[in-house]
Amino acid sequence: MCDIQYTVSMKTQNQNEQLDNLSQELRRGALPLAVLCMLQENKYGYALIGELTTAGVEMDQGTLYPMLRRLESQGLLQSSWVVDGARPRRYYVISPQGREVLASLSGEWQKLSRVVQSLLEQIEK
């Protein structure tokens, strides 16, 4: 009896790990798109996390800040330091190149979304 429970428990655990890994892969591709969408105007990191969370996109600082630096190094974002208050804040905004990339990515995302939605609807029939 214990062996059966252990086997079922391990299967469930493995399935949960698989689901978590696949969910992370889905999010990894979507997060830069979400960040570019949200940076149409200057925002600092902490405020951006709040707005993303409000929009339904959970992201922690350990994910966001490396992504912001990477997107900036790719020329998709611009940043500036603003000192007004207790401490300086680095503000980010989408660059002209970032707007072009966002327009292309948006089209790709919509196309992919339609295809996946169609495939899911076929399964549900």
Predicted regions, residues:
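Beta-hairpin "wing" of winged helix-turn-helix
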Residues: 74-87, 93
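Generic recognition of well-ordered alpha-helical segments
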Residues: 50, 96, 111-114
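Basic, amphipathic "hinge/linker" alpha-helix immediately C-terminal to the N-terminal HTH DNA-binding motif
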Residues: 88-106
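Alpha-helical DNA-recognition elements
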Residues: 70
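Short, intrinsically disordered or compositionally biased N-terminal tails of bacterial proteins
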Residues: 1-21
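N-terminal helix-turn-helix DNA-binding core of bacterial DNA-binding proteins
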Residues: 22-65
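Short beta-strand/turn micro-motifs at beta-sheet edges
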Residues: 20-24, 79-81
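Amphipathic alpha-helical dimerization/coiled-coil segments
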Residues: 3, 103-125
